[in-house]
């Protein structure tokens, strides 16, 4: 299923940096975190869904790359985002 369009708009609205922002690292990381949380719940009931598990691992790696990029360019924004999404460093 994934993220509903309404939920996606909510996330973009809450994490955007300016009025037409959809691609900033904060928005991308927030959307990825939402998808990761959805897939994590999915695996609690579908333990043998290895195909989707591979997608989850790739998604986590992509989010980690974006987090490292954000940490490199602006540690303050990185810290706020980590705290706001309540994810590990």
From Swiss-Prot:
Q: Which proteins does it associate with, and in what oligomeric form?
A: Part of the 30S ribosomal subunit. Forms a bridge to the 50S subunit in the 70S ribosome, contacting the 23S rRNA.
What gene is it encoded by?
rpsO
Pfam families from the UniProt entry = Ribosomal_S15
Q: Does the keyword Transferase apply?
A: no
Identify the species of origin.
Thermodesulfovibrio yellowstonii (strain ATCC 51303 / DSM 11347 / YP87)
Q: Which PROSITE patterns match?
A: RIBOSOMAL_S15
Function (record text): One of the primary rRNA binding proteins, it binds directly to 16S rRNA where it helps nucleate assembly of the platform of the 30S subunit by binding and bridging several RNA helices of the 16S rRNA.
Q: Which GO terms describe its biological process?
A: translation
What UniProt keywords are attached to this protein's entry? Ribonucleoprotein, Ribosomal protein, RNA-binding, rRNA-binding
User: Under the cellular component aspect of Gene Ontology, which terms does the record hold?
Assistant: cytosolic small ribosomal subunit
The name of this protein is Small ribosomal subunit protein uS15
Xref: InterPro entries? Ribosomal_uS15 (IPR000589), Ribosomal_uS15_bac-type (IPR005290), uS15_NS1_RNA-bd_sf (IPR009068)
Question: Signal: present as a keyword of the record?
Answer: no
One GO MF term = structural constituent of ribosome
The UniProt entry's sequence similarity note says: Belongs to the universal ribosomal protein uS15 family.
- Per its UniProt entry, which superkingdom is the organism in? Bacteria
């Amino acid at each position: 299923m994934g993220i509903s369009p309404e939920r996606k708009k909510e996330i973009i609205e809450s994490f955007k940096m300016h009025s037409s922002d959809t691609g900033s690292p904060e928005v991308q990381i927030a959307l990825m975190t939402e998808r990761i949380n959805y897939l994590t719940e999915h695996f609690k009931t579908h333990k043998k869904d290895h195909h989707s598990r591979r997608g989850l691992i790739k998604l986590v790696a992509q989010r980690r790359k974006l987090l490292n990029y954000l940490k490199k360019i602006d540690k303050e924004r990185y810290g706020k985002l980590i705290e706001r999404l309540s994810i590990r460093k």
